[in-house]
Amino acid sequence: MTAKKRSASSTRWMQEHFDDHYVKLAQKRGLRSRAAFKLEELQEKDHLIKPGMTVVDLGAAPGGWSQVAVKLVGDRGKVIACDILPMDPIVGVDFLQGDFREDAVLNALLERVGDEKVDVVLSDMAPNMSGSDGVDQPRAMYLVELALDMCHQVLAPNGSFAVKVFQGEGFDEYMKAVREAFKVVKTRKPDSSRARSREVYLVATGYKL
């Protein structure tokens, strides 16, 4: 991508961002990102999170999904969040800053979880996009594979998993792996996802040990 193209692309993104209905609505409701509406839509359709549950939120910053999750689990529940980027504190959310790809960070996250299994694993992780599918897609697939591996380590029987996946090379194989691990897997494209984005969300329920 040339500097001129990149500049035009960035300008278009900024214009879309500021004109975006969901961005304005998020600001009005005090939500940290428009992504919060994606989780709200998934919750409305699939009822993933219930009061008293323990939820792990991967790729949490700036905190839109954690804000939604902590309200849903209530005082008796727990939300454990992780991101490579910093995140301002949210009451009721135990946040760990670090690169989830590193063993030390994974181990620290597992320590936060403790011996209790979790009910829901959420992943809105995405790599820094370079604009090259040949680079971006493998990076994105690596992250979602790590998220599925996290499910295998911490998820309770019949637990649930919601993960952002970019359609492209490796998607079908990943879908197969998720289907092998869960009883029911649905593909969702929330209304709040940008139409031109290749992102979809896999909502998997009924974790099979």
Swiss-Prot record:
<feature type="active site" description="Proton acceptor">
    <location>
        <position position="164"/>
    </location>
</feature>
<keyword id="KW-0963">Cytoplasm</keyword>
<keyword id="KW-0808">Transferase</keyword>
<dbReference type="GO" id="GO:0008650">
    <property type="term" value="F:rRNA (uridine-2'-O-)-methyltransferase activity"/>
</dbReference>
<feature type="binding site">
    <location>
        <position position="65"/>
    </location>
    <ligand>
        <name>S-adenosyl-L-methionine</name>
    </ligand>
</feature>
<keyword id="KW-0698">rRNA processing</keyword>
<dbReference type="InterPro" id="IPR015507">
    <property type="entry name" value="rRNA-MeTfrase_E"/>
</dbReference>
<dbReference type="InterPro" id="IPR050082">
    <property type="entry name" value="RNA_methyltr_RlmE"/>
</dbReference>
<comment type="similarity">
    <text>Belongs to the class I-like SAM-binding methyltransferase superfamily. RNA methyltransferase RlmE family.</text>
</comment>
<dbReference type="InterPro" id="IPR002877">
    <property type="entry name" value="RNA_MeTrfase_FtsJ_dom"/>
</dbReference>
<dbReference type="InterPro" id="IPR029063">
    <property type="entry name" value="SAM-dependent_MTases_sf"/>
</dbReference>
<feature type="binding site">
    <location>
        <position position="124"/>
    </location>
    <ligand>
        <name>S-adenosyl-L-methionine</name>
    </ligand>
</feature>
<dbReference type="GO" id="GO:0005737">
    <property type="term" value="C:cytoplasm"/>
</dbReference>
<protein>
    <recommendedName>
        <fullName>Ribosomal RNA large subunit methyltransferase E</fullName>
        <ecNumber>2.1.1.166</ecNumber>
    </recommendedName>
</protein>
<dbReference type="Pfam" id="PF01728">
    <property type="entry name" value="FtsJ"/>
</dbReference>
<comment type="function">
    <text>Specifically methylates the uridine in position 2552 of 23S rRNA at the 2'-O position of the ribose in the fully assembled 50S ribosomal subunit.</text>
</comment>
<feature type="binding site">
    <location>
        <position position="63"/>
    </location>
    <ligand>
        <name>S-adenosyl-L-methionine</name>
    </ligand>
</feature>
<keyword id="KW-0489">Methyltransferase</keyword>
<feature type="binding site">
    <location>
        <position position="99"/>
    </location>
    <ligand>
        <name>S-adenosyl-L-methionine</name>
    </ligand>
</feature>
<keyword id="KW-0949">S-adenosyl-L-methionine</keyword>
<feature type="binding site">
    <location>
        <position position="83"/>
    </location>
    <ligand>
        <name>S-adenosyl-L-methionine</name>
    </ligand>
</feature>
